[in-house]
C-alpha cells in the first residue's frame, strides 16, 4: 500500500515510549514501496558536536556573518554522516529536491556556504539518519500504531525550539498530547 509520505513528518506515538524514537519528529526525505524510507530526526538537538566543532573537523573556516544552524541527531544509522535539510532556495552538487519546498544536501559545499554566511534561507543539520526497509514503515504505521503522520511546516522542521516540536506536530494534527498514553488500563 503506497502511502506517499515523502515530505511529511513522522511523529512518535506512545507505542515508542522508552525506545530510541521516543517523542521524535522525523522529516521523511524519501519513501517508496520499492526502496523503503529515509528520514531525519529534526527535534533531537545535539550539544556536541556543535556547528563550530564540525567546521573545525572539516577544515572549514567560518567568516562573518556566519549563519547559525542547529545540529541534530538525525537517526541511528550512519552517525558520522552529515545531512543538511534546507529550503529549496539553494541547491548544489548532490542536492536532492524532496518536495519542491525542501531540499536535502549531503556535500561539504553547503557547509562552506553556510560558514560564509550564504546558502539556503533555512536549514537544519543532522548527523545520521533513520531508515526503513520496504514495507517496514507501513507496518509500523498501520499495524503497530507507532507513528502519527503530520504535515511538515517550516516552524517544526527548521525551528530552533526543539523541545516543543513533538507537541507542535501533534497539535498540527489535532491531537492533544496530554490525552496520549502508552498503555490502556481498566477501571
From Swiss-Prot:
InterPro entries on file: AlgH-like (IPR003774)
Assigned GO CC terms: cytosol
Superkingdom of origin organism: Bacteria
Cited Pfam families: DUF179
Annotated family: Belongs to the UPF0301 (AlgH) family.
Protein name: UPF0301 protein GOX1459
Protein species of origin: Gluconobacter oxydans (strain 621H) (Gluconobacter suboxydans)
Species lineage: Bacteria, Pseudomonadati, Pseudomonadota, Alphaproteobacteria, Acetobacterales
